[in-house]
Amino acid sequence: MSSLLRKMASKKQRATEILLILKKLYPGATCSLDYQTPVQLLVATILSAQCTDERVNKVTPALFQRYPDANALAYGDRQEIEELIHSTGFFRNKAKNIQGACRKIVEEFDGEVPQRMEELLTLPGVARKTANVVLAHAFGILAGVTVDTHVKRLSQRLGLTKATDPIRIERDLMKLIPQPDWENFSIHIIYHGRAVCAARKPLCGECQLAHLCPSAQAS
């Protein structure tokens, strides 16, 4: 076996061990955004950019009560939508993207959120992260690995990727993790990033992944 293949096999084994440990640590881990329909999940995920899921969940009840579906959001009052989502940050751009995405859903997809990655990526404000979340949690379709700030940070610290670009990170992780666990991996990594492996002061001394983590061993 070549050194490259041995390295890949070693990374795969570590990724498997990491996920097994995280599943035990966070047995109830799931998407933490509140939603009732695919379009509501799409909107909530757009709002979650540069914002916590907790904050998004405080905003969406009033937003979805006023604008419950794609048609209502697409042709609703822009200023009112901006006011309702103001606390999530970047509210003008988010309102523009939400309305643009919902308008396209209404006009080109018969009011239904598309279930194909290529089609989702044509919606304003939707990149692979948002598309992966919607496909996995609204439709049970595993098209890739969701890469948010936690997944990016922890995957690098754990030595699973050297890439900095989210698309390259996703490709690296897809090679290491079996497809049925693609979204499981992201969700559990996100939980661990929030609880233990923070950006500025990771709690390496308390981390149950420390023995598998090059960054913890180097610190």
Swiss-Prot record:
According to the record, how does the cofactor bind? Binds 1 [4Fe-4S] cluster.
According to its UniProt record, which cofactors does this protein need? Answer: [4Fe-4S] cluster
Q: Look up the record and give one Gene Ontology term from the biological process aspect.
A: base-excision repair, AP site formation
Q: Per UniProt, where does [4Fe-4S] cluster bind?
A: C197, C204, C207, C213
Provide the catalytic activity annotation: 2'-deoxyribonucleotide-(2'-deoxyribose 5'-phosphate)-2'-deoxyribonucleotide-DNA = a 3'-end 2'-deoxyribonucleotide-(2,3-dehydro-2,3-deoxyribose 5'-phosphate)-DNA + a 5'-end 5'-phospho-2'-deoxyribonucleoside-DNA + H(+)
Family matches, as SMART domains:
ENDO3c, FES
- Which GO MF terms are attached to this record? 4 iron, 4 sulfur cluster binding; class I DNA-(apurinic or apyrimidinic site) endonuclease activity; DNA binding; DNA N-glycosylase activity; metal ion binding
Superkingdom in the source lineage: Bacteria
Task: Briefly state the protein's biological role.
Answer: DNA repair enzyme that has both DNA N-glycosylase activity and AP-lyase activity. The DNA N-glycosylase activity releases various damaged pyrimidines from DNA by cleaving the N-glycosidic bond, leaving an AP (apurinic/apyrimidinic) site. The AP-lyase activity cleaves the phosphodiester bond 3' to the AP site by a beta-elimination, leaving a 3'-terminal unsaturated sugar and a product with a terminal 5'-phosphate.
Q: Which NCBIfam families match?
A: nth
In the record, the note on similarity to other proteins reads: Belongs to the Nth/MutY family.
Instruction: Please report the name of this protein according to its UniProt entry.
Output: Endonuclease III
* UniProt organism field: Synechocystis sp. (strain ATCC 27184 / PCC 6803 / Kazusa)
List the taxonomic lineage.
Bacteria, Bacillati, Cyanobacteriota, Cyanophyceae, Synechococcales
Q: Which gene encodes it?
A: nth
